[in-house]
């Protein structure tokens, strides 16, 4: 009789189901995996858009802008001028192309690792911008002259006194600024607030 009462007790069945679910999760509470997958997808979609836009605009710039002959768009402030940059974003650190290539590879690996536990859409946006920009300039580093890991990046946007840049540079800088802001306000990649219990 006792066995029959236990088998008919819905509470006991619910507890058993909960234990079965927790067996797969050492923490005892399974994380909402669909949210993580969605944020990771958002990260890669943003990175893909930045990468595709960067590559397309560079192809158009090389095909249509003659070196040394800028195309003026807004007065004498904004223009398109073709520059092949051996340095980092905004023509910084010229002469260190191979080192910048290694740094960019490290950035890509770091972003992908963080993306494994990503749950914040804002972090997905920031990391996606950085990842897309890093990949865009890496393509130039590996496949443009003068050689692998020493290729010069194509820059073509000139605004006033600011160094000539490209779409990838803009993605890296905007993404980095967003990540700094998120860090300052205490928002973690997993969506939690620093100092607030999960």
Swiss-Prot record:
Translocase as UniProt keyword: no
Principal cellular location given in the protein's record: membrane
Catalytic residue list: 155, 169
Catalytic activity, as annotated: Release of signal peptides from bacterial membrane prolipoproteins. Hydrolyzes -Xaa-Yaa-Zaa-|-(S,diacylglyceryl)Cys-, in which Xaa is hydrophobic (preferably Leu), and Yaa (Ala or Ser) and Zaa (Gly or Ala) have small, neutral side chains
Transmembrane regions: 42-62, 92-112, 120-140, 167-187
Molecular functions per Gene Ontology: aspartic-type endopeptidase activity
Pathway listed: Protein modification; lipoprotein biosynthesis (signal peptide cleavage)
Topology with respect to the bilayer: Multi-pass membrane protein
Keywords annotated in UniProt: Aspartyl protease, Cell membrane, Hydrolase, Membrane, Protease, Transmembrane, Transmembrane helix
One record GO biological process: proteolysis
Alphabetical list of Pfam families matching this protein: Peptidase_A8
PROSITE patterns: SPASE_II
Disordered: annotated span: 1-34
Subcellular location: Cell membrane
Record's GO cellular component terms: plasma membrane
Biased amino acid composition, Acidic residues: 12-26
InterPro entries listed in its UniProt record: Peptidase_A8
EC number(s) per entry: 3.4.23.36
Family statement drawn from the similarity comment of this UniProt entry: Belongs to the peptidase A8 family.
Protein task: This protein specifically catalyzes the removal of signal peptides from prolipoproteins.
Protein name: Lipoprotein signal peptidase
Name of encoding gene: lspA
């Amino acid at each position: 009789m006792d066995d029959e009462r236990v088998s008919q007790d819905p509470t006991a069945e619910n507890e058993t189901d909960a234990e079965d679910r927790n067996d797969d999760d050492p923490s005892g509470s399974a994380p909402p995996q669909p949210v993580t997958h969605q944020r990771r997808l958002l990260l890669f979609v943003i990175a893909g858009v930045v990468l595709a836009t960067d590559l397309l605009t560079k192809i158009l710039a090389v095909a249509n802008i003659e070196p040394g002959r800028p195309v003026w768009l807004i007065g004498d402030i904004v223009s398109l001028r073709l520059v092949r940059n051996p340095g980092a974003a905004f023509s910084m650190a010229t002469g260190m192309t191979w080192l910048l290539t290694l740094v960019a590879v490290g950035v890509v690996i770091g972003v992908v690792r963080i993306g494994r536990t990503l749950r914040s859409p804002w972090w997905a946006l920031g990391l996606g911008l950085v990842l897309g920009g890093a990949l865009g300039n890496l393509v130039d580093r590996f496949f443009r002259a003068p050689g692998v890991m020493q290729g010069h990046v194509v820059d073509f946007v000139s605004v006033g006194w600011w160094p000539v840049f490209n779409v990838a540079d803009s993605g890296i800088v905007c993404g980095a600024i967003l990540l700094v802001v998120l860090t300052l306000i205490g928002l973690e990649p997993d969506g939690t607030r620093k100092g607030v219990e999960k």
